[in-house]
Amino acid sequence: RLESVKILPSEGTDNSPELYGAITADASSMAEIANPQAKRVFCMAVTADKYVTKDGAPSSWSAELDSIIAGVIDGIKKLYVVSAGNVQFDELKNTQYPSANINHTIEDPGQSWNAITVGAYSNRIQLDDKVFKGWNPIADVGELCPFSSTSIAWDNKWPIKPEILMDGGNAITDGTNIDICDDVSILTTNRDVIGRPFTTTNA
């Protein structure tokens, strides 16, 4: 059974960073109150790229997430899977791979000790689109996805993140320029379920 709790506000507004932890706790509680007997895995693919702790130190959000997972308030331990956060396309163009991935550290709250943080590797290298004739994938099979953040730059006293990797697609280059295309991207669902139920993405 799939459950969903919205934690992002309406378009054009933002939650206060000081409330990220409380909002996450409320979202967890809403799901558990609605169906207390269910055994669930929480998946949170939302990060705060504006509030990255470059050294891996805890934030109020990651600390609250650790508390939620440990069951400090309700005595119920939880399994949380969170995203590591994405290297932006402009970073790849300006800094290049893999330096951009080293410089872009895991985004808040991915530094949570108790959460399983998910990064990405690349598994797609076949390029058939004739528009990109002469281009090549940036990452080889099994290598770090060009869009995945890392914890390489963190202080040694903080955990090594991410714990697991999943296929996050790839990017392509002609030796000078960088781009993306469907051939090396991940198929996913689209919000336009009638007109275009599927789309592609990179993570």
Put a short name on every predicted segment.
Residues 104-203:
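Extracellular S/T/G-rich loop segment that most often corresponds to the catalytic His/Ser-adjacent loop
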Residues 2-3, 79:
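Nucleic acid-processing catalytic cores of prokaryotic defense/repair systems
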Residues 1-2, 115:
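Extended, compositionally biased low-complexity polar/Lys-Gly-rich tracts
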Residues 8-114, 122-125, 198-203:
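Substrate-binding/access-modulating region of protease and related hydrolase catalytic domains
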